[in-house]
A protein has these predicted regions:
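Conserved beta-strand hairpin/beta-sheet module of binuclear metal-dependent hydrolase folds
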Residues: 2-64, 151-154, 158-162
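Metallo-beta-lactamase
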Residues: 2-5, 99-149, 193-199
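Short catalytic-loop micro-motif centered on adjacent basic/acidic residues
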Residues: 43-46, 71-74, 137-138
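Active-site metal-binding motif and surrounding structural segment of the metallo-beta-lactamase
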Residues: 51-98
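Short, basic, glycine/proline-bearing loop/turn elements
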Residues: 70-71, 133-134, 181-189
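Internal, well-ordered alpha/beta segment that forms a basic, Gly-enriched binding/recognition surface
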Residues: 138-169
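Active-site gating loops and adjacent loop-to-helix segments of metal-dependent hydrolytic enzymes
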Residues: 166-188
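Conserved small/polar residues in nucleotide/adenosyl-binding loops
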Residues: 203-207
């Protein structure tokens, strides 16, 4: 599914999970979001839950159309965003993983067999990465709702990849009132970090 001419949605729908994180009922499933940004260099934003590795990798391969990804951007280390890092790197071993210092500390703990010393790009808050006409800016969002979270802003397309900050329950192939499930998600998942989410709105408005 195209978001823009250069940004392709490669996420998956989950209708297998009854309780998200073991406590939130999701009668209409969940969507795990991931994107491919195509330019002179190609970036993949986030992975998905490990149960959907094959479907996600097929989606990524179709979006790449025979090209190889240059970067895998990890915005959040919760498993529904990061579980397929290892599977991805087995297929695309020359890819550089983009994250912050806390991201790479977590990767080292979650994926002990991975050696990323020459395959990582550690970014700081406000750093940019140029793919060609697309310039990506990384905006740290600690405790929205984990300490390593960062958002990615594409200044060319004016698209914000917002990790969990503005998420919702529900798969994308189910028609439902967006605001009801977004409100329930916010209250359950990130509401306790409301001040941090408000800060996201403030500093992304200046990006």
């Amino acid at each position: 599914m195209k978001v823009t001419n250069d940004i392709i949605y490669v996420g998956v729908n989950d209708h297998q999970t009854d309780l998200f994180e073991g406590q939130y009922a999701v009668p209409n499933g969940m969507a795990y979001n991931s994107y491919v940004i195509r330019d002179e260099k190609v970036a993949v934003v986030d992975t998905v839950d490990v149960k959907f590795a094959h479907e996600w990798l097929d989606n990524v391969g179709a979006a790449l159309g025979g090209t190889k990804p240059d970067y895998l951007i990890i915005q959040h280390m919760e498993p529904d965003h990061s579980a397929n890092i290892y599977n991805f790197m087995k297929i695309y071993p020359d890819t550089t993983i983009v994250g912050n210092a806390k991201t790479f500390t977590m990767i080292a703990n979650f994926f002990r067999d991975m050696d990323l010393d020459e395959k990582k790009l550690e970014v700081k808050n406000g750093d940019t990465l140029t793919l060609g006409k697309h310039e990506l800016q990384f905006l740290f969002a600690p405790m929205v709702h984990w300490p390593e979270v960062m958002l990615t802003y594409d200044s060319y397309e004016k698209v914000l990849f917002s990790a969990d900050a503005f998420g919702k329950f529900g798969a994308l192939d189910v028609e439902e009132d967006w605001d009801d499930e977004a409100r329930r998600y916010y209250i359950g998942i990130v509401g306790k970090y409301g001040m941090q989410v408000q800060n996201c709105l403030l500093y992304t408005s200046d990006a």
